[in-house]
Regions:
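N-terminal organellar transit peptides
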Residues: 2-106, 110-114, 123-129, 142-292
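Short, charged, surface-exposed secondary-structure boundary motifs
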Residues: 137-140
């Protein structure tokens, strides 16, 4: 009887030991999986550089970032004087949507002006260096008048149009007073759209936005005083800020757009920019464009 009891006790112990071992294995596996996931977490850095004429590569990058569950935050690294109105607005709106999913921060390098600044306003927090150039909240549109040159060269240009305003901005003739009035109205409307976007995202009063929206530029220090940015700092400060929000330190960084995309998209505009037609296209710009 004693041997039977001893056998049962030993068997019970073996069963309990097995259970404990199984539980330990499960716990270790869970911790290993958790550690693996956390070690793969990262911050995306979206680099926006140069004059913005086509938002495609940036929109595609933001879609990739949004669909990647390992990306816990986004830093938009801006070094741009702005660009075309529609492109700047598309990127701005896409960033606002992305900000609802993850923390987003803008980091202005040398310049984040006009459309570049509008893009920064699509994020939840804006950093700039003390000497960065920003602001330039305005609209510009330039039309070339080659009518005197055409007359000198004795060229004849015949235009057949369906309406009085169909050839507005045609470089072969000067703008009429009515055309100037129409274009001024257009610029004013788009300028008001810019002001509304900035005042809404930055929480500015009508008086505050009117004070900074005449097209003037600001240094980072001045922009901080005018509530156009949140803090003075560069990429490191932006990373620390994001990590503080998501409570995950020392995250990996993944840069967008990918290098092959940037190379391809850089070649095509370079070819396009060599064309005389590019100089003559009729577009409105959120662009800081000093004549040096």
């Amino acid at each position: 009887k004693l041997s039977m009891v001893s056998f049962m006790i030993n068997r019970f112990k073996n069963i309990e030991i097995k259970k404990v071992l199984i539980i330990l294995v499960i716990i270790l596996f869970a911790f290993s999986a958790l550690f693996s996931l956390s070690s793969n977490d990262k911050i995306a850095i979206l680099e926006i550089e140069g004059v913005i004429k086509n938002p495609k590569q940036y929109l595609e990058s933001m879609r990739d970032i949004s669909e990647d569950d390992s990306i816990k935050g986004l830093i938009v690294r801006i070094d741009s004087p702005g660009g075309t109105v529609g492109s700047s607005q598309e990127i701005h709106e896409s960033l606002i949507k992305l900000s609802n999913k993850m923390p987003t921060v803008a980091s202005i390098v040398d310049i984040g002006a006009s459309g570049g600044y509008l893009i920064a306003c699509g994020t939840s927090h804006i950093f700039a260096n003390s000497g960065s150039i920003t602001g330039s909240i305005g609209v510009i549109s330039q039309y070339y008048n080659f009518s005197k040159l055409i007359k000198f060269l004795k060229f004849d240009i015949e235009t057949i149009k369906s309406g009085q305003m169909k050839d507005i901005g045609d470089s072969s003739k000067a703008l009429t007073n009515e055309e100037k009035r129409l274009l001024n109205s257009l610029v004013k409307d788009i300028h008001n759209q810019f002001k509304l976007s900035v005042s809404k995202t930055r929480g500015l009063t009508d008086e505050e936005i009117n004070e900074v929206s005449d097209g003037r530029i600001f240094s980072g220090n001045q922009a901080l005083e005018m509530k156009l940015i949140d803090k003075i700092g560069g990429l490191e400060e932006a990373i620390i800020y994001i990590e503080g929000i998501i409570q995950l330190p020392n995250l990996d960084l993944e840069y967008f757009p990918k290098k092959e995309e940037k190379l391809l998209d850089g070649i095509i505009p370079a070819i396009d920019n060599s064309s005389l037609l590019n100089m003559l296209n009729k577009k409105l710009y959120y662009l800081y464009s000093p004549k040096f």
